[in-house]
A protein has these predicted regions:
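Terminal ABC-like ATPase head and other globular end-domains that cap long coiled-coil arms
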Residues: 1-170
């Protein structure tokens, strides 16, 4: 049991440090600067310690995540989610309006970063934001033409690149 406990502690510390470094990288990209870091609660067993998320958006002082505006909180949380996703991509991910509190410029950075992650993960994103929809490959919408009857609408946004390629010359 002691050997298992030591292994868990070592693995936790290693993964925590990896996530901490990646979180700062993603934070800087999504915020266009600033700094994001993670801290473990002190004077507590590491396997039971809380984790503080510390954020410093560009032009602001370093502060606990709970002191941020709604949009800053959302973008900080998204940064942490994407940092973990970068380190250990899951095959698919469902995001339900996580960018709702963001302003348009932050939605654009979020959508561009999300699109980069689609190389390793399929995302199902529920959104009302045009900036997020613009980064999608395919949109599905639900409309109600008549009361009680829902209709599914699908729009494929991937352009057919075959017509754009120059003809081969021999």
């Amino acid at each position: 049991i002691e050997e298992l406990d030591t292994g868990m502690r070592n693995q936790f510390i290693e993964k925590f440090q990896e996530i901490k470094v990646e979180f700062d990288k993603v934070f800087k990209e999504l915020f266009g600067g600033g700094r994001g870091t993670l801290e473990l609660e002190e004077d507590v067993d590491i396997l039971e310690a809380g984790i503080r998320i510390i954020s410093q958006p560009p032009g602001k002082k370093l502060q606990n995540m709970m002191q941020l505006s709604g949009g800053e909180k959302a973008l900080t949380a998204i940064s942490l989610l994407f940092a973990i996703q970068n380190l250990k991509p899951s095959p698919f991910c469902l995001l339900d309006e996580i960018e709702a509190a963001l302003d348009d410029s932050n939605v654009d950075r979020y959508a561009k970063y999300l699109h980069k992650l689609t190389k390793n993960t399929q995302f199902i994103v529920i959104t009302h934001r045009r900036g997020t929809m613009a980064a999608a490959d395919r949109l599905y919408g639900i409309t109600m033409q008549e009361k009680g009857v829902s209709t599914l609408v699908s729009v494929d946004l991937i352009e057919d690149q075959l017509d754009d390629k120059p003809a081969k010359q021999e």
